[in-house]
């Protein structure tokens, strides 16, 4: 009888599922889905943060037609300039030659100043501040070059005479004597050269004799200078 009661009691026992067991998902399945969603969000953010590549603009190809047109225009301008010069009178041609010479001289002076390291904004002779012997030599070369640009003027000889006198005022008697000796030597050499050039028959195509000085290397840029300018630099 007791066995029957125990069997009945066992058969009436009902195991009720807990709240967690009522969910139709495996343990940890919700966590997996949350992790998956977070991964997807991170991938989307990375895609948004990736910089967009911009293609470099293609280099323009040279326009052959434009290049040919520019060359033709330059050629026509050169021909027109040559025709203009050809139609000038002798006096106008001389004036044009002097104009171009002045332009070239200004360019040469600029190059000479750059070679001497003259970079001051004031420019010109005011930029020099000579202290050493070499610096005074460079300053004298530039000053002589500048002055010699006016050598064709009828007033140039008197100008040089006045300039030498005003410079010698600040010298001692011994220094003035040295200047005087150099001028006398220069005068003697000039007389010899003038006589030699006067004796040569004209029309043989030989150049006249010129006087060379030790400053020729320094004043090599003075391609428009004459003998007097070079000699003047020597005794200055």
Curated annotation (Swiss-Prot):
Answer whether the UniProt record assigns the keyword Protein biosynthesis to this protein: yes
Its annotated compartments are: Cytoplasm
Its recorded name reads Eukaryotic translation initiation factor 3 subunit J
- Where is composition skewed (Basic and acidic residues) in this entry? 47-58, 68-77
Protein family according to the UniProt entry: Belongs to the eIF-3 subunit J family.
Q: How does it assemble?
A: Component of the eukaryotic translation initiation factor 3 (eIF-3) complex. The eIF-3 complex interacts with pix.
Q: What keywords is this UniProt entry annotated with?
A: Cytoplasm, Initiation factor, Protein biosynthesis
Role, per record: Component of the eukaryotic translation initiation factor 3 (eIF-3) complex, which is involved in protein synthesis of a specialized repertoire of mRNAs and, together with other initiation factors, stimulates binding of mRNA and methionyl-tRNAi to the 40S ribosome. The eIF-3 complex specifically targets and initiates translation of a subset of mRNAs involved in cell proliferation.
**Where in the sequence does UniProt note compositional bias of the Acidic residues kind?**
28-46
Per the record, GO CC terms?
eukaryotic 43S preinitiation complex; eukaryotic 48S preinitiation complex; eukaryotic translation initiation factor 3 complex
Instruction: Name the GO terms of the biological process aspect.
Output: formation of cytoplasmic translation initiation complex; regulation of translational initiation
């Amino acid at each position: 009888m007791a066995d029957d009661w125990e069997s009945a009691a066992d058969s009436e026992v009902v195991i009720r599922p807990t709240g967690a067991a009522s969910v139709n998902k495996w343990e940890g399945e919700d966590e997996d889905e949350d992790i998956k969603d977070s991964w997807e969000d991170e991938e989307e953010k990375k895609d948004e943060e990736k910089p967009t590549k911009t293609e470099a603009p293609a280099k323009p190809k040279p326009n052959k037609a434009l290049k040919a047109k520019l060359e033709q225009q330059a050629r026509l301008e050169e021909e027109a300039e040559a025709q203009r010069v050809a139609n000038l009178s002798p006096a106008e041609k001389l004036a044009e030659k002097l104009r171009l010479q002045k332009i070239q001289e200004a360019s040469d002076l600029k190059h000479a100043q750059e070679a001497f390291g003259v970079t001051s904004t004031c420019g010109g002779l005011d930029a020099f501040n000579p202290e050493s012997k070499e610096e005074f030599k460079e300053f004298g070369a530039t000053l002589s070059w500048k002055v010699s640009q006016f050598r064709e003027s009828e007033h140039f000889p008197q100008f040089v005479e006045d300039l030498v006198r005003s410079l010698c005022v600040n010298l001692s008697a011994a220094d003035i004597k040295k200047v005087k000796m150099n001028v006398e030597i220069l005068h003697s050499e000039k007389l010899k050269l003038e006589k030699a050039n006067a004796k040569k028959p004209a029309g043989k195509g030989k150049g006249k004799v010129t006087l060379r000085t030790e400053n020729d290397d320094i004043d090599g840029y003075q391609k428009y200078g004459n003998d007097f300018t070079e000699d003047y630099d020597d005794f200055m």
